[in-house]
């Protein structure tokens, strides 16, 4: 990843492993959404040892972090796990709806009412995450991710993003412009950017890269949105 960052002239790389990729976290939290593949870490020390391998890598600042799921009923347990170490950056993500419903589940009902209700529940859950103090996170990631499983977004999607970004601004959080979703749902990411422009909510660019060739993906598209809507980037 660091080598790929240097090749693409990235000066700062934040590595944020999913909290669900740690075996000890899965022992205390029942995650409704997990990656079926990818490395599992036995401990935070196991993970942090990977950063020792890239110390002194000229030209790239590497930040150690986590992408942490917000699951209301497990907020305390997740918070205790995350607080075991000091992190350079913490991201907060909602990957599941209450009841452990995976956002990317394509088998859920897709009629207009069901889809709209699901989107509203998703936005409310993200607001809850922002207002929560379960971890001291800086960035709410991919607020449009539900589109993977529920592609029919509500007609007032941008209004919902205005409400969400307003809450984020009030609580000192930034909202992510996600590189993966700029490929999958560019029109929704654009509406997220527009909403942040209206509320003066800060944004962050994240490539959401799981492989080296995805580092800085769609950064050019994110940059255009940042310029168009006069967004402040953290």
Where on the chain are the PLM-derived regions?
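Domain-core and long-helix interface of multi-subunit machines
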Residues: 92-199
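An N-terminally biased module of ancient metal coordination in phosphate/nucleic-acid-related enzymes
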Residues: 1-72, 82, 147-151, 155-159, ...
């Amino acid at each position: 990843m660091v080598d790929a960052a240097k090749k693409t002239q990235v000066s700062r790389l934040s590595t944020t492993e999913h909290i669900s990729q740690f075996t000890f976290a899965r022992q205390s939290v029942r995650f409704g959404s997990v990656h079926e593949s990818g490395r599992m870490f036995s401990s935070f020390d196991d993970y942090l040892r990977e950063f020792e391998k890239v110390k002194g890598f000229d030209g790239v600042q590497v930040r150690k972090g986590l992408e942490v799921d917000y699951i209301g009923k497990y907020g305390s347990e997740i918070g205790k796990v995350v607080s075991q170490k000091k992190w350079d950056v913490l991201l907060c993500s909602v990957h599941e709806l209450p009841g452990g419903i995976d956002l990317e589940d394509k088998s859920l009902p897709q009629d207009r009412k069901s889809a709209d209700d699901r989107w509203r529940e998703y936005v409310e859950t993200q607001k809850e995450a922002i207002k929560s103090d379960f971890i001291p996170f800086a960035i709410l990631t991919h607020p449009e991710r539900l589109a993977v499983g529920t592609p029919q977004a509500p007609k007032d999607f941008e209004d919902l993003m205005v409400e969400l970004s307003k809450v984020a601004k009030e609580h000192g959080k930034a909202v992510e412009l996600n590189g993966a979703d700029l490929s999958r749902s560019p029109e929704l990411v654009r509406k997220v950017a527009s909403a942040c422009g209206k509320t003066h909510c800060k944004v962050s660019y994240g490539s959401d890269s799981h492989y080296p060739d995805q580092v800085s993906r769609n950064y050019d598209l994110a940059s255009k949105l940042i310029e168009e809507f006069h967004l402040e980037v953290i």
